Amino acid sequence: MLLGVATLVYNYVRFHSFTDFGYARIPGVLNEPWYNHGIFSYHYIPRQIWEMLWRPWETRAKFPYLAPNAFSSSILWSSPFVLFAFRSGAKDKALKYTCWVAVFVLCILLWIHGNSGGWQFGYRYAMICLPFLFVIMLESSPKKLTPLEWVAYGFSFVANLYATWLFHWTEYMK
C-alpha cells in the first residue's frame, strides 16, 4: 500500500497528475495502433483476453513450421500447466480465494492496457499473475504428480525450450 501511494505521489511530483505514469509522453506512442483508445481503456479487454488465453502459435509454410507470435501468444500454449490452478479443493481455502482475487484484479488491470507485451513468446504480462497462480496450484495439488500433470509440465518445458531456441539460436528472429 505504501509503495502504491508513493508511486502516485511520485507521478504527481513529475507530471502534476496522480494517474499519469508518463507512457503517453513517449514521442509517438499514442500513434501506435494498439493505443487507439489511449494507454488504458476498457475497449482493450476482449483483445487482451484473446491474446492472454487463446491466441495460438502460428503455422508457417517453411521452417519453423510452428512458432510463437513474437508479440504475444496464449499462456495456455506456452504453459498449459496453469490450468491446474482450476483444480478444486485447497489446504487453505482463504489463501486460495485471496490469490484468485489478486489474479482477477491483476488481469483486469493488464487487460485494460493497450499493448500485450512486446517482443517475446507467450503473454509477457502473465508473469505478474504467476506467483499467485503457483500458490493456488500448490494449495490444491495432490501429494503426488498425476500422469496428466507430468504431460502438462513436460509439454510446457518443451514448448518453452523450443521457443527459447527459436528466439536465441535461429534465424527466426532476424
What is each model feature region?
Residues 1-174:
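Membrane-proximal envelope and lipid/glycan-remodeling enzymes
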